[in-house]
Amino acid sequence: MASSIMSSAAVATRSNGAQASMVAPFTGLKSNASFPVSRKTNLDITSIASNGGRVRCMQVWPPINMKKYETLSYLPDLSSEQLLSEIEYLLKNGWVPCLEFETEHGFVYREHTSSPGYYDGRYWTMWKLPMFGCTDATQVAAEVQEAKKAYPDAHIRIIGFDNVRQVQCISFIAYKPEAF
């Protein structure tokens, strides 16, 4: 009975040969004492690899009096030659030209909801039917002129539609009213 009544402190201090040679478990990273010290002496903020100093350069497009209509709409209006060149590019890729116009808003807007990411003003009115089988850029330009005569205060855009993949591939503003 005397052997079973032993203090726990006596058991903890007892060690045999196997326990003395055990290595402590891994508890973290290696110490820096074994590695050479190489610190950067230049503390200039421009030398730090971070975009924190460049955040001031990023700006949001101002929505007041600078409406964005389509891709690259911040560029100057297309001349007649540039417009024909864009239409020829559209036709060369085999896309179907289609004209659309908008009499009130020539830009994306919210009208019936305030949900973020949803804009119900994305849809324009189609001018006639898509020009299936059209191979002449001047024919599309003539339709733009006809639409300008019918709606002089409307925005007119040309869409290139791929009827095989059933997607819109290109869209650009062909005419903006003088007020814009």
UniProtKB/Swiss-Prot annotation:
InterPro entries assigned: RuBisCO_ssu, RuBisCO_ssu_dom, RuBisCO_ssu_N, RuBisCO_ssu_sf
Short name of one Pfam family: RuBisCO_small
Keyword Plastid: yes
GO CC terms of this entry: chloroplast
Residues of the transit peptide: 1-56
Keywords: Calvin cycle, Carbon dioxide fixation, Chloroplast, Photorespiration, Photosynthesis, Plastid, Transit peptide
Any one Gene Ontology BP term: photorespiration
Subcellular location, record wording: Plastid, Chloroplast
Keyword RNA-binding: no
Domain of life assignment: Eukaryota
GO molecular function: ribulose-bisphosphate carboxylase activity
Subunit structure: Heterohexadecamer of 8 large and 8 small subunits.
Membership in a protein family: Belongs to the RuBisCO small chain family.
Protein function: RuBisCO catalyzes two reactions: the carboxylation of D-ribulose 1,5-bisphosphate, the primary event in carbon dioxide fixation, as well as the oxidative fragmentation of the pentose substrate. Both reactions occur simultaneously and in competition at the same active site. Although the small subunit is not catalytic it is essential for maximal activity.
Note: The basic functional RuBisCO is composed of a large chain homodimer in a 'head-to-tail' conformation. In form I RuBisCO this homodimer is arranged in a barrel-like tetramer with the small subunits forming a tetrameric 'cap' on each end of the 'barrel'.
Protein name: Ribulose bisphosphate carboxylase small subunit, chloroplastic
Organism expressing this protein natively: Stellaria longipes
Organism placement in taxonomy: Eukaryota, Viridiplantae, Streptophyta, Embryophyta, Tracheophyta
